[in-house]
Amino acid sequence: MANVTVVGAQWGDEGKGKIVDWLAERADVVVRFQGGHNAGHTLVVNGVTYKLSLLPSGVVSGTLSIIGNGVVIDPWHFRDEMERLRKQDVVITPDTLAIAETSPLILPLHSELDGFREDRSGDKKIGTTRRGIGPAYEDKVGRRAIRVCDLAHIDEIGSRLDRLIAHHNALRSGFGKPPVDREKLVNDLKEIAGCILPFAKPAWRILADEQKKNRRILFEGAQGVMLDIDHGTYPYVTSSNTIAGSAAGGSGMGASAVGFVLGIAKAYTTRVGAGPFPTELDDEVGQTLGERGHEFGTVTGRRRRCGWFDSVLMRQSVAVAGITGIALTKLDVLDGFDEIKICTGYKIGDKVYDYLPPYYKDQAAAKPVYETIEGWKESTAGARSWSELPAQAIKYIRRIEELIECPITLVSTSPEREDTILVKDPFLG
């Protein structure tokens, strides 16, 4: 059995939660390997909706779940999210959930700095969730971070706390903000430590043991390839590497553990927040896509921008993320359109591109070159086999495969877990 790594193939919000939940039923371990609580997952199981942003999707099904060292953790959000799920009768214990001891913490000073920067940015906002993800990663790279393991030694890390606070006080001074209250921060950390430490474990060792037992491991990515800090629409990106290769470093496993890479993509395209979006539709069609697809961010509640499927971006995502197969979601949202468009290139000035150039002004100026195909009137909602799909919907799927140079492995036709068409089992490689 192969391991499976799930990544978003667009700008996030592709429906990874449902697909991961569907796969988690057959996995032995589910691992988050990057990001923080800025990425929302919505699961619908037996008519019950679960919303997660930090915890791996496997917790809902009771699958062993691990938050890897590549994830930045807000301990207070962890507590609140866990309590909310427990109220929905989800069982979460140290036997079913582990947090890497080396995961960096998101502290209140990180989310505050995030907000200070966004407020100062004016009309040039990146569109951050203001949850401190970026500043926490900055401190990790700057070797200032307080990590999960440090919560067991708060009284012994005074010099490190002083260095961290001095750095942030210098930044806060530039924004005209008061210094960090050191005493309060220490007390807050001592208070929350008891919630986190029971789950703190050597995640790399657990995973190594599971691998030796030939367990099926499912790596759950957050955000999407086009939000990757290196390969995305910079600077309108997240603060971590979202591509499949990060599963190795962000979990403590070797590169060979990544296995089958399943990219999740909507049958159209959406984006939350600022940044280039060549196929964005500021018209009735875009509004219809948003209404039918219930396009609001799980974490922020912000309305998502909507547009036609972009095969250029997808082909680029497939290449840089090493995607083996695609899970196509929300096909049912396209039911009833007379015609559907697919972006096959970009025009920037007098030049046509078959990829998205890296310069941000070129990205903003890119105009889509469309191919138009006939739509379908029949409903695809709830379909669980190819025979239930309209012929024109199948034609649309096949055309996407040709354009992105990657096979469609799964098709999702509703938020319900079982409304999924399996073309190829990712766990079989």
UniProtKB/Swiss-Prot annotation:
CDD domains: AdSS. Keywords: Cytoplasm, GTP-binding, Ligase, Magnesium, Metal-binding, Nucleotide-binding, Purine biosynthesis. Its EC number is 6.3.4.4. Pfam families: Adenylsucc_synt. IMP binds at residues 13-16, 38-41, 129, 143, 223, 238, 302. The active site is at residues 13, 41. GO terms for biological process: 'de novo' AMP biosynthetic process; IMP metabolic process. The keyword Endoplasmic reticulum does not apply. One of its GO terms (molecular function) is magnesium ion binding. SUPFAM superfamilies: P-loop containing nucleoside triphosphate hydrolases. Substrate binds at residues 298-304. Binds 1 Mg(2+) ion per subunit. It is found in: Cytoplasm. InterPro entries: Adenylosuccin_syn_GTP-bd (IPR018220), Adenylosuccin_syn_Lys_AS (IPR033128), Adenylosuccinate_synth_dom1 (IPR042109), Adenylosuccinate_synth_dom2 (IPR042110), Adenylosuccinate_synth_dom3 (IPR042111), Adenylosuccinate_synthetase (IPR001114), P-loop_NTPase (IPR027417). GO terms for cellular component: cytoplasm. Belongs to the adenylosuccinate synthetase family. Plays an important role in the de novo pathway of purine nucleotide biosynthesis. Catalyzes the first committed step in the biosynthesis of AMP from IMP. This is Adenylosuccinate synthetase.
